[in-house]
Amino acid sequence: MCRVLAYLGEPIGLSHVLFETDSSLVRQSYNPRMMETFLNLAGFGMVAWDQRSLRAEDPFTYRATTLPEFDRNLRSLARKLGPTCLIAHVRGVTHTEREIVGESNLHPFRFHGASVALAHNGHLRDFTRMRYDLVEHVRPELAREIEGTTDSEWIYALVLSHLEDPYGRPDADQLSQATMAALRVLREVRARHGIDTSSPVNLCLSTGDVLVATRFSFDYGWYPDEDHLLETDLPYVSLWYTVGGEYVQGENGSRMAASDVPRSLLIASEPLTVDISTWLEVPEYAMITATRRDDVLEYETLDLDV
């Protein structure tokens, strides 16, 4: 299973959250503390926005199939970047020759001209049976943008297709509604084909101004074919968050600094620190939405109505 990290708030040290914390995103790729039976060796990707930069609406984008732990370019860039919004992802695939490992399959996905980026931690079982049913729900101009072979890129195109303007800048409510609409379509197509195998769909989406994240699974716990059941399939795919003033590194380790007024939100597949006292688990079948206005973070947790 993949690992994902998303952030919205005060400028954050990219090297810190990717490489330096106890359970940094890159460390999770080879030495996770949760769902530790699965290694994420199929590449790294990120989109990072900085409101202080030129063309702040356009994120810095990086993708590489190189193992991120040994990626000197990524380490060098991470030491220099302090984004105000971020989605980063390490990709995990089953270790078979059937998997396609390449740049076109790396998350986050962001079509040319689109404002929304998406990363997915999960797996739609029997996706090959679903793929072409989704064509009727995806706008043709978006379907033509799909370059890879993943279920995740189709989910992304499906979300964009449910926005009034796929190339506009949706607010948190518009993006959350489009995400829920996409999940409903997936449920409908699964039912059409009689697919009822457990399929997690943890998503992180952002425009650089708003952030939406889901912790969700279709038919959790149902595996009709136990011969192909993996140990990593058993737990509900995790997602955690911490909110406060800013994420800091001090003498006693990393933490989200307390603040009377929230300014920053950090979401990750697992807490980035051994001390998880400042972290909360995103409820199952829930969504977090966040918007940052005038240096104040507005966020809420919603039940997913799918």
Enumerate the predicted regions with their spans.
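N-terminal segments that mediate ammonia production and transfer
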Residues: 1-306
